[in-house]
């Protein structure tokens, strides 16, 4: 299936995305966080890259352990491997953030993730956007296991161009 053959019916995609962000009963999400996520989704739709990948990603970030273990979706199975990448890359920072969240559970946490810079043969520096987005997804997935309200960390740390590179990577690999 090519990306052009995908169903990009905007109302249907938006319905899927909004259904994917439903939290368990008793949970609540800060309206500012929802606004941030919705702005990013709207930007993605306006710029015409595949919002179905975003819907799958948002669904992945809200799935519980049983749903993850029973999934047949290859894209979600790949997303599950990103947690180890995040642990390898961010190490103790993951534990420090989790400690901070446990210490102040009702507070909004600003989480800035660093990027690993690579030196090019021309003595300049670059960041591999796909690898960075994978690590951020893994990091957010770890946070969401504690409390499923930290998806905003993904959208606060990843730029549009980096996200677009990641979407292209997923579409090329699976569609």
Curated annotation (Swiss-Prot):
Annotated Gene Ontology cellular components are: host cell nucleus
The biological processes this protein is annotated with in GO are: symbiont-mediated suppression of host cytoplasmic pattern recognition receptor signaling pathway via inhibition of IRF3 activity
| Residue spans crossing the bilayer | none
The UniProt entry, under InterPro entries, shows: Poxvirus_Bcl-2-like
Q: What induces it?
A: Expressed in the early phase of the viral replicative cycle.
Pfam hit, one: Poxv_Bcl-2-like
UniProt entry keywords in alphabetical sequence = Early protein, Host nucleus, Host-virus interaction, Inhibition of host innate immune response by virus, Inhibition of host IRF3 by virus, Inhibition of host RLR pathway by virus, Viral immunoevasion
User: Where is this protein localized, as stated in its record?
Assistant: Host nucleus
Described purpose of this protein according to its UniProt entry: Plays a role in the inhibition of host innate immune response. Within the host nucleus, inhibits activation of interferon-beta promoter by inhibiting IRF3 activation.
**What family is it from?**
Belongs to the poxviridae OPG036 family.
Protein name, UniProt field: Protein OPG036
Q: Which organism is it from?
A: Vaccinia virus (strain Copenhagen)
For this protein's source organism, the top of the classification is:
Viruses, Varidnaviria, Bamfordvirae, Nucleocytoviricota, Pokkesviricetes
Gene this chain is encoded by = OPG036
